[in-house]
């Protein structure tokens, strides 16, 4: 007889190898066929809503690791909420307007922009955006992200644009929208204004100059001919100078040096003297800043007046304490210039070239004008010092080229009238991490008006008409009419029709006696697009609600979407569009460096999915502390793949060992399970509670470690290890075997559900092998519930103590193995000399302790004092390990002196002989 045939070995079709790159697309195909998203929504209908509102990625290019991190985190939350008592719809979105698409067409696609109308160019932009959406959609779906992919929201869709117009109109009605000429961030490389959110800082080398302005009218405080010293790193703005700002409360000195007298802040004399190179100098007069007001100096190049003004923005951090002021090129300059009635002079055009308002420099690119301007200052004797510095300077986030401040006529959203409401809304929102609140609060507190106009083609037009007298027209009637036109035809109609055709029929206005109108040519900042999604998506879609429960984006969105969304929402509704905001860090390479093509360290999601599979990428997301910056590399992914393998192998072992188990008739009631089996269910209860709480708190790394540890420690290295001696060896219906199978079944079912939001492909693959479930997918179930287990606290304490004793036994066996006393642990003979506590513990355990230790012989040999000298000492007592006497049983591989006692089965121990005789002999 072949005794192998009498062993109940595991049987499962669940493969050992994941083969995820090939298997996942098949699983996703099944999800598509069954329309899993709709099935989940139908199942959870009527439950409390949980809405995670998708911040729209920009529709350009392949997805990168930042996208993958973001979408997978969202998917964890939506999936876990729909398994935790909520109705959790997820509508993905795309941001589709703006410069990158224009640039992609004109640069890469060789579109001749100047040879077509605006409307024709915009049609090409729209086509391109849709192509990009399709590409990204396929990549997001490949990640296993579940959502309403057939009905996403897209900012270029007519229904979205129509609602955006309503948001603009409502803000205009409340007086928050105005047109004004003031300095804004201007990108010569994009030929457009930029919002603060579109600025990033990079180091730049700039000239650093000290310039003397001669006093023309000292107002009896200064002497004519004395020189006020300014410092600037933008010589190109000197032609635009109209004034000099000083701080009213600072002390200023007249310093005699080299035959001239110079005016500067007293606190900065030494640093200025050193920078300019005064050999010896002395203070001949001091005066308060406020006494210098209205003094008139002379512009060093043009001889015009330069007025001394008082400004609280002046500091002694650097420079001279006398600040060169060009109202057309700086925010503080503009504000103080308005106060003192100065013109807004801006001698730089949209391409960054000097205009005729800068005589002698017209036509020069502003940066190239620095040198000739400095040379002219030197010729006039006004240049005191030229040097160069490297400093952090604002750049256009798209073109990576420097920006300037440039005064132009722009449309603005003013937040000053509702800033307090905004700050209150920030305080009422739940922020994770908590520092997010401070970050956004300070941004809003310190923020100026928001420049919302852009001088580009691809975007939502600013819905403003102009009367013949130049008066802008924004009324309820015009806004509603334009909104309806956009809903019906899309915003391209604005560029296809004349103003009169876009106005309501019979529209009249006192400013247009001849009935003629023109329309605004600028478009809206793209942040106004996505910032209106709370109205266009949350409010408008029947399956969603405003406010959303959660916005979840990268930490760069405090200045972006989190900011624009709350600004428009509070302006229109008085409330934040979200109850909670969660932010994540950036994806870096394995060494913590930013990914860049030049470094060659870019990790691409598609490559990871082709090599490892989406579930490995998702498990990586679960493993990291995502609220900070996260690292990803081949080596890191290989470590994650090992954890995946452990989880998968656990599934396979548990499933293989319940092949002949029918829960309806074979399950043992929980109170009738052996204590060691109850112990595993108690540990499973703890895991269920821990994992559910972690999903609730978005703490996915806790789940990653908890599930891995449970599989590796409680199951693999303890329970599943000694289980083999029961589930393989005993007869099919043995109570101990059915007891363990009951635990295997409960545990496997719970584990598959617990891990399903993180590893949806693997969980559903395992689910498809279950014969005892009615649902087509694990996604159509809820998180497992904990079981009531009698005397759980006492059982857990008892077996936790036992595990400490077992650790000592394992160490003793390891030492004996190293000393060649034994080979495998299963052939060992153990003699324990336990301390009082361990002795009491051993006598309280009803199970076969020898089986729990997986050894052939076990004896309790009295007290520690009775132990022989060669015994190993541990905290729980002393242990002697020897080779068990006897022969090895052919069937259970344990050593016994009783092998062959049954003459029919001379190779078996009495236990195995009894099983074979009773259950396997005809």
Swiss-Prot record:
Which Gene Ontology cellular component terms are annotated? cytosol
Q: What class of enzyme is it?
A: ligase
Q: Which CDD domains match?
A: Anticodon_Ia_Ile_BEm (cd07960), IleRS_core (cd00818)
Which amino acid positions bind Zn(2+), per UniProt?
A: 889, 892, 909, 912
Keyword annotations: Aminoacyl-tRNA synthetase, ATP-binding, Cytoplasm, Ligase, Metal-binding, Nucleotide-binding, Protein biosynthesis, Zinc
Q: Which GO terms describe its biological process?
A: isoleucyl-tRNA aminoacylation
* Main localization category: cytoplasm
**Where on this chain is 'HIGH' region (motif)?**
57-67
Say which domain of life the source belongs to.
Answer: Bacteria
Catalytic activity field: tRNA(Ile) + L-isoleucine + ATP = L-isoleucyl-tRNA(Ile) + AMP + diphosphate
Against InterPro entries, the record matches this protein to:
aa-tRNA-synth_I_CS (IPR001412), aa-tRNA-synth_Ia (IPR002300), Anticodon_Ile_BEm (IPR033708), Ile-tRNA-ligase (IPR002301), Ile-tRNA-ligase_type1 (IPR023585), Ile-tRNA_ligase (IPR050081), M/V/L/I-tRNA-synth_anticd-bd (IPR013155), Rossmann-like_a/b/a_fold (IPR014729)
Can the keyword ATP-binding be found in this entry's annotation? yes
Check the record and name the NCBIfam families matching this protein: ileS
For this protein, the record's HAMAP family field holds: Ile_tRNA_synth_type1
What is the role of this chain? Catalyzes the attachment of isoleucine to tRNA(Ile). As IleRS can inadvertently accommodate and process structurally similar amino acids such as valine, to avoid such errors it has two additional distinct tRNA(Ile)-dependent editing activities. One activity is designated as 'pretransfer' editing and involves the hydrolysis of activated Val-AMP. The other activity is designated 'posttransfer' editing and involves deacylation of mischarged Val-tRNA(Ile).
* Quaternary organization: Monomer.
Please state which protein family the record places this protein in: Belongs to the class-I aminoacyl-tRNA synthetase family. IleS type 1 subfamily.
Name assigned to this protein: Isoleucine--tRNA ligase
- Organism of origin is Bacillus licheniformis (strain ATCC 14580 / DSM 13 / JCM 2505 / CCUG 7422 / NBRC 12200 / NCIMB 9375 / NCTC 10341 / NRRL NRS-1264 / Gibson 46)
* Phylogenetic placement of the source organism: Bacteria, Bacillati, Bacillota, Bacilli, Bacillales
